[in-house]
C-alpha cells in the first residue's frame, strides 16, 4: 500500500509532494534514526532532578567543596533525557513525516509500554550517544503496534542502557479512535 502524501500546488501551477506520512504499512523493522550525543553535566543532572521533583541532595550541587564527590551519578530515569526516543527523527531519516508532525490530520501514536535495561551508570562527564530504530511491528486484537529500541553508549563506547518503547500506530475497527 502506497503511503498517503500531501500534494500542494505552487504559484507556478506545478504540484509538489511535501510529505509522506509514516503510516503503519510503511514502517519497516530496521528503520533507524540519526545519532544524538548529549554531554552529561552536574548542572544537567540537577536540572533533571528538579524537573522530576526528586529531593535527593545527591543530585544537586554541593553546599560546600568538602561534600563534593568526584563524579555525580545520574538517576536511572535520566536515560529518557539523555537518550530520547525522537520518533519524528526516525521517520524523517527514512523519508517520512511522523504522524504527529503531519500538516494535515495529525494524530498521536499512543504509548503502550516501555521496558528499560541498564548496563552501566550514567554520570557527570559522560558523553551519551544514542540512536533509535524500529525493533518490531505486530498486530494484536486488530490493533497495530510498533516497538522502537533506543540504544545508548558512553564516550568509551560502553553500552549504558537500552529501552524498548511500544506505541499503538492504529486502533482496530470500532476501538478508540478520533472519530468515535
Predicted regions located by residue number:
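HotDog/MaoC-like acyl-thioester-processing domains
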Residues: 13-28, 111-113, 117-180
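Short, Lys/Arg-enriched N-terminal segments with co-localized hydrophobic residues
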Residues: 2-13
